[in-house]
C-alpha cells in the first residue's frame, strides 16, 4: 500500500478494517504483537479431549491461536471458529461473565473474519457437544486488512496460483497437496539413504550450461566479470563426484530451463538425479520403480492412487517395458530402424498430417534421432496410460549415454511414463572420454545448424572422464511431475508458488 492510496481508492471492507487497525493503535492495543503465549495448537487440544461429553467443563487451561473463519455474535455470548495452519478447526466462546463487558464489546467491534486471534481459557464441551475454549481473555494476534474470499464462491485457478497463501487458508485440497509434496520429498531422501546413496550439492550457477538439451537462463557475475548460467541439470557435476570416488550419489534441488510453460512444464522445477557405480540402465529402472512405489506407500499409504475423477491408478507390481524403434514400427505399420532416412521419416510425418508441425519440418539441424522421438511421441507416447518404461533411444539425441551393447545405432536409455506423463529418464552412462568428445562435437555441429538446445563442449568434464569414471547408471526425475502422477493435478497445482506473469498494473 503506497502513500498515494487514499481512502476513496480502497474497497469498503479494506477501509473499514484499516480504520479498525488505526483505532486499535490509538487505544494502545498493538494489532500485530511480537508474540502471544500460545500453549497448545488446535490439534493438540482436540487430541487431548477426543470424547468430551456434552456440556462438560474441564480444568485444562490453554492458550490457543488461529484464524477466524466463522463468527457469530449475540448479546452476552460470541462464538468463533478458529483454524490452524494445518486446517484443524476449534470453536472458541467469548462470554460476558468470563471476560467482562469491555472485552466482549471489543470482540464485537474489532474482530473480523480472517483475523488471527489468541484466546486463553478452559477447555469445555458446549451444550451442543462442540469442543471449545471458553475464554477468560483474548487479543488480536494479527489484524487482517483484506477479507477472505466468499465461502460459497470458489476461487478461480488463476487466483489460486497468484495468491497461494489465500488458497492455503480457504481450501483444504491446497493444504493437502503442499503437505503431500513435503512428505514425498522426505520419503525420497529416506529411501535413497536407505540404499546407501549420499546427498551432495553441486553448483546452481555454472559457467557452461550442460547435462541436458535445454535453453538456459543467463546472468552475469559482477565480481568475476563473467557470464554465468542457471543450471539446466546437475548431471555433469554429479558425474565428477563419481570420478572422485563416490559410489552412490544423489541431488534433489532446483533446475531452470528457459523454455515454454504449460500443463507439464515449468521454467523452474525440482529435479532428482541419482548415480550409482557398477550398474546399468536396467538396474536404475528397478531402483526408480521401487523408489516411486515406496514413496506412494509412505506419503499416500497406498499404491492404488486415488484420482480426482474417483478412479484409481495402480502402480503396484512390475511395470511394462517397450522399446522405442519396435513400438514405433508397430504403430506406423512399417519397420523403422536407426538406418531409416530423414526423408522417409518426414514423409511418414506428412502422411500423419504433421506436414506443418514445426518440430518435424524445421531448419534447426534436427536429424534422424529428433524425428524418431517426435514421431514416437505423437503415436505411441500419447497412447500410454499404465506405468511404462520405453527403452533404447537414438544415439543422436542422447549424447551422454552409452552405446547399446548389442543394438547398433541406439543407446541404453529409458524414459518412464506414468499416467501418460514423461516422468523420469535413466542411462547406462557414457564413460569413454574419446567417444564423449565426439558426441560433443556432433552437438556443436547441430548448434551451428540452428539447434539452440544442443549441448556445449565441456572441457573440464572431459578432463574428469579422462581420469577414468567407473561404469555407472544415472537417473533424473522431476518432483513436480511425480506429484502430478500421484495426484492427477496440473503442474501449477503441485508447485507451492509457481511463476506467473505479473499483472499489468
UniProtKB/Swiss-Prot annotation:
Record-linked PROSITE patterns: AA_TRNA_LIGASE_II
InterPro entries: Aa-tRNA-synt_II, aa-tRNA-synth_II, aa-tRNA-synth_II/BPL/LPL, Lys-tRNA-ligase_II, Lys-tRNA-ligase_II_N, Lys-tRNA-synth_II_C, NA-bd_OB-fold, NA-bd_OB_tRNA
Domain of life: Bacteria
Pfam families reported for this sequence: tRNA-synt_2, tRNA_anti-codon
Catalytic reactions on record: tRNA(Lys) + L-lysine + ATP = L-lysyl-tRNA(Lys) + AMP + diphosphate
Disulfide cross-links: none
Binding locations of Mg(2+) 1: 415, 422
Principal subcellular localization: cytoplasm
UniProt record, GO biological process: lysyl-tRNA aminoacylation
CDD domains in the cross-refs: LysRS_N
GO molecular function: ATP binding; lysine-tRNA ligase activity; magnesium ion binding; tRNA binding
Positions bound to Mg(2+) 2: 422
Keyword Nucleotide-binding: yes
Cellular component GO terms, alphabetical: cytoplasm; cytosol
Keyword Magnesium: yes
Cofactor: Mg(2+)
Subcellular location: Cytoplasm
Key words of the record: Aminoacyl-tRNA synthetase, ATP-binding, Cytoplasm, Ligase, Magnesium, Metal-binding, Nucleotide-binding, Protein biosynthesis
Entry coiled-coil feature ranges: none
EC number of the protein: 6.1.1.6
Cofactor info, note text: Binds 3 Mg(2+) ions per subunit.
Note: There are two lysyl-tRNA ligases in M.tuberculosis.
Family to which the UniProt record says this protein belongs: Belongs to the class-II aminoacyl-tRNA synthetase family.
Subunit structure, as described in the record: Homodimer.
Name of the molecule in the record: Lysine--tRNA ligase 1
Species: Mycobacterium tuberculosis (strain ATCC 25618 / H37Rv)
Organism phylogeny: Bacteria, Bacillati, Actinomycetota, Actinomycetes, Mycobacteriales
Amino acid at each position: 500500500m503506497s502513500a498515494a492510496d487514499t481512502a476513496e481508492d480502497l474497497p469498503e471492507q479494506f477501509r473499514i478494517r484499516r480504520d479498525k487497525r488505526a483505532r486499535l493503535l490509538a487505544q494502545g492495543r498493538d494489532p500485530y504483537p511480537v508474540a502471544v503465549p500460545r500453549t497448545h495448537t488446535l490439534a493438540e487440544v482436540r487430541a487431548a479431549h477426543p470424547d468430551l461429553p456434552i456440556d462438560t467443563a474441564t480444568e485444562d487451561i490453554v492458550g490457543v491461536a488461529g484464524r477466524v473463519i466463522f463468527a457469530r455474535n449475540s448479546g452476552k455470548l460470541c462464538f468463533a471458529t478458529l483454524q490452524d495452519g494445518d486446517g484443524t478447526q476449534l470453536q472458541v466462546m467469548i462470554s460476558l461473565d468470563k471476560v467482562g463487558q469491555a472485552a466482549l464489546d471489543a470482540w464485537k467491534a474489532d474482530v473480523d473474519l480472517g483475523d488471527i486471534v489468541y484466546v486463553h481459557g478452559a477447555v469445555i464441551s458446549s451444550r451442543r457437544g462442540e469442543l471449545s475454549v471458553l475464554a477468560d481473555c483474548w487479543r488480536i494476534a494479527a489484524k487482517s486488512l483484506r477479507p477472505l474470499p466468499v465461502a460459497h464462491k470458489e476461487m478461480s485457478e488463476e487466483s489460486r496460483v497468484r495468491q497461494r497463501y489465500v488458497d492455503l487458508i480457504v481450501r483444504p485440497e491446497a493444504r493437502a497437496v503442499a503437505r503431500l509434496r513435503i512428505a514425498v520429498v522426505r520419503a525420497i531422501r529416506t529411501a535413497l539413504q536407505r540404499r546407501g546413496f549420499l546427498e551432495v550439492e553441486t553448483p546452481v550457477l555454472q559457467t557452461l550450461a550442460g547435462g541436458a538439451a535445454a535453453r538456459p537462463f543467463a546472468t552475469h557475475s559482477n565480481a568475476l566479470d563473467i557470464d554465468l548460467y542457471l543450471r539446466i541439470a546437475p548431471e555433469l557435476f554429479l558425474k565428477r563426484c563419481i570420478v572422485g570416488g563416490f559410489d552412490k550419489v544423489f541431488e534433489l534441488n532446483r533446475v531452470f530451463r528457459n523454455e515454454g510453460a504449460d500443463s507439464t512444464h515449468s521454467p523452474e522445477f525440482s529435479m532428482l538425479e541419482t548415480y550409482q557405480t557398477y550398474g546399468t540402465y536396467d538396474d536404475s529402472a528397478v531402483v526408480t520403480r521401487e523408489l516411486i512405489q515406496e514413496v506412494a506407500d509412505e506419503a499416500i499409504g497406498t499404491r492404488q492412487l486415488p484420482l480426482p475423477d474417483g478412479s484409481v491408478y495402480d502402480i503396484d507390481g512390475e511395470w511394462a517395458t517397450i522399446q522405442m524403434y519396435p513400438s514405433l514400427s508397430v504403430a506406423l505399420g512399417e519397420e523403422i530402424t536407426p538406418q531409416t532416412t530423414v526423408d522417409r521419416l518426414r514423409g511418414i510425418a506428412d502422411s500423419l498430417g504433421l506436414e506443418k508441425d514445426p518440430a518435424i519440418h524445421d531448419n534447426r539441424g534436427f536429424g534422424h534421432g529428433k524425428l524418431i522421438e517426435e514421431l514416437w511421441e505423437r503415436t505411441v507416447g500419447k497412447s500410454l496410460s499404465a506405468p511404462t518404461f520405453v527403452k533404447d533411444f537414438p544415439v543422436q539425441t542422447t549424447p551422454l549415454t552409452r552405446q547399446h551393447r548389442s543394438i547398433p545405432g541406439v543407446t541404453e536409455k529409458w524414459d518412464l511414463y506414468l499416467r501418460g506423463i514423461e516422468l523420469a529418464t535413466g542411462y547406462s552412462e557414457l564413460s569413454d572420454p574419446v567417444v564423449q568428445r565426439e558426441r560433443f562435437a556432433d552437438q556443436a555441429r547441430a548448434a551451428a545448424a540452428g539447434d539452440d538446445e544442443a549441448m556445449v563442449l565441456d572441457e573440464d568434464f572431459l578432463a574428469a572422464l579422462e581420469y577414468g569414471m567407473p561404469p555407472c547408471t544415472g537417473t533424473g526425475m522431476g518432483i513436480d511431475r511425480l506429484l502430478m502422477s500421484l495426484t492427477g493435478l496440473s503442474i501449477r497445482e503441485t508447485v507451492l508458488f509457481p511463476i506467473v506473469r505479473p499483472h499489468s498494473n
